[in-house]
Amino acid sequence: EKGADLTETDLSSAKAVKEDFAGQTLEYRGETYELSLAGSYQTENAALAQPVKKEKRVVFMGNSITEGWVNTHPDFFKSNGYIGRGIGGQTSYQFLVRFREDVINLSPALVVINAATNDIAENTGAYHEDRTFGNIVSMVELAKANHIKVILTTTLPAAAFGWNPAIKDAPQKIASLNARLKAYAQTNKIPFVDYYSSMVSGSNKALNPAYTKDGVHPTSEGYDVMENLIQQAINKTLR
């Protein structure tokens, strides 16, 4: 039912994750990303009224790619009434812990989930595909249990991560997870948006230089590509 409580196991896991990440930060290109699970959108969420009748609210759940999207193309979100809930540096573990606060409690009709870049970059520890995939599946299941539709999206391409050059096999890990997400979405009849295929470039499977300056985060041109793809999927899902 809507607002159903998490199990004791879920709560214990969430508490452990929260304690593990408390106070952690990531330094990259002169910027400091806060990795804690504090309510970064607490004020915005509190100020957001519940949707009116027939309103089809859409929340975008993500990391700095989503956060940067809102900052780079604010009109895309404002004009469509979309709500961005991206936090730079975060992994799927942290998404899962704040999913109730930043998605379920906002009563959207639909959530768009984009995850795993920072998992693969090992922002909060060694990468385990099964665990990252499981976190994403858990978010889908939580959404469905609360009558929220879901659009899953691919992790964007990246040949490497400037803040963690020790990761040498990012393209392989991204491709593997994306294939698994696509299969899961098809099996469970979940809309799936493939940003990856439209944005990948070269034999090293990098994010197309036309769409990025640092190899990971999209520029305005990159977000143009993403908007065209996601808008079609949202319209189809909510019609």
How should each PLM-predicted stretch be described?
Residues 1-59, 71, 106, 235-239:
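N-terminal secretory targeting modules
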Residues 5, 81-83, 189-191:
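Conserved beta-strand segments of alpha/beta enzyme cores
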Residues 55-71, 88-91:
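Catalytic nucleophile-elbow at a beta strand-turn-alpha helix junction centered on a G-D-S/GDSL motif
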Residues 61-64, 85-88, 114-118, 153-157, ...:
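Active-site-proximal beta-strand/loop segments in catalytic clefts of secreted hydrolases
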Residues 112-116, 136-140, 146, 150-153:
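Conserved, well-ordered alpha-helix/loop/beta-strand core segments that scaffold catalytic motifs
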Residues 157-239:
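Catalytic His-Asp segment of secreted/periplasmic serine-dependent ester chemistry enzymes
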